[in-house]
Amino acid sequence: MKSGRFIGVMSGTSLDGVDVVLAAIDETMVAQQASLTWPIPVHLKKGILDICQGQPLTLSQLGQLDTQLGRLFAQAVNALLAQQRLQPRDIVAIGCHGQTVWHEPTGEAPHTLQIGDNNHIVAHTGITVVGDFRRRDIALGGQGAPLVPAFHHALLGHPTEKRMVLNIGGIANLSLLFPGQAVRGYDTGPGNMLMDAWIWRQCAQPYDKDAAWAKEGQVILPLLQKMLRDPYFAASAPKSTGREYFNYGWLERHLTAFPGADARDVQATLAELTAVSIAQQVLLNGGCERLMVCGGGSRNPLVMARLAALLPGIEVSTTDKAGISGDDMEALAFAWLAWRTLAGLPGNLPSVTGATEASVLGAIYPANPITQS
């Protein structure tokens, strides 16, 4: 069974940077050793957003973006290697999620697309890459997401305590870790995505630092109620979503009935939408003893405060309190998934995704042995 140092690479729907994490992994442990966040250039971010918003593009443009992202991921990995004074031969493999540009797991031909050419990562790092984790699950009738609940269970499951793990990235997803029950999990709806999109359009800021802008506003209750009537929130699990659904266009359509709304009030309402839509799902599943939060949204004091207020009797804390950085959780999960793939172990949970069976996930892009010598 493959064990040793693995690198996880994650570029999520928030587009707030490429998260890269180094971890020692075997069948008994996942020990994080180092991490960094690598910036995404503005032109690449724009290209990704254009695709996710349904803007037309040529196959040449898509191919160029695929190549550029692969090179960017390689740069991020090499920066971590240099920081830690490591050589390619010191790393067993890289687990790279890629950048989701479209996720449509239902319909006549379900599909999901992550770009960032893994061949370029191998070529520029000299390290074996495991990627394309989601499409096997979709081929087996699953949603292809979320994949992190299996990792949450491995690291944070408890024999007696009823726990949930909440990841607030661009999209928020919930993992239900109940003793004696199959792990369940799904996307609850928007996490940071709409808040980030609004402040970017209004203030040219990538995110609302410390929720300072949202705190200046007041929740527009009719707008909140209108958004919460979106059918996604009432749909039953398994379910997953992404930027192709909850995007700036979605927000604009809801705002047409509220001309002249104060921009700060809209930001406050979007923060409340994230908190309320999550809290509703926590309660719908019977609540828990501890809600452990990770992802960029765990650093949003307004969202965290609202979750605590909406969920009395539940301990709401970040995964940092359990010794796992909330900023690195997803990248760490894909390092772990790479280890499972190389070990021939399944990476999905049918109880989460709805797939017909558990399966080894991903595709392996082997490094040239000469570069690893």
UniProtKB/Swiss-Prot annotation:
Its EC number is 2.7.1.170. Gene3D superfamilies: 3.30.420.40. It is an enzyme of class 2 (transferase). Keywords: ATP-binding, Carbohydrate metabolism, Kinase, Nucleotide-binding, Transferase. Pathway: Amino-sugar metabolism; 1,6-anhydro-N-acetylmuramate degradation; Cell wall biogenesis; peptidoglycan recycling. The keyword Kinase applies. GO terms for biological process: 1,6-anhydro-N-acetyl-beta-muramic acid catabolic process; amino sugar metabolic process; peptidoglycan turnover. Pfam families: AnmK (PF03702). The keyword ATP-binding applies. Signal peptide: none annotated. It catalyses: 1,6-anhydro-N-acetyl-beta-muramate + ATP + H2O = N-acetyl-D-muramate 6-phosphate + ADP + H(+). It comes from the Bacteria. ATP binds at residues 12-19. One of its GO terms (molecular function) is phosphotransferase activity, alcohol group as acceptor. Catalyzes the specific phosphorylation of 1,6-anhydro-N-acetylmuramic acid (anhMurNAc) with the simultaneous cleavage of the 1,6-anhydro ring, generating MurNAc-6-P. Is required for the utilization of anhMurNAc either imported from the medium or derived from its own cell wall murein, and thus plays a role in cell wall recycling. Belongs to the anhydro-N-acetylmuramic acid kinase family. This is Anhydro-N-acetylmuramic acid kinase. It comes from Salmonella paratyphi B (strain ATCC BAA-1250 / SPB7). The lineage of its organism: Bacteria, Pseudomonadati, Pseudomonadota, Gammaproteobacteria, Enterobacterales.
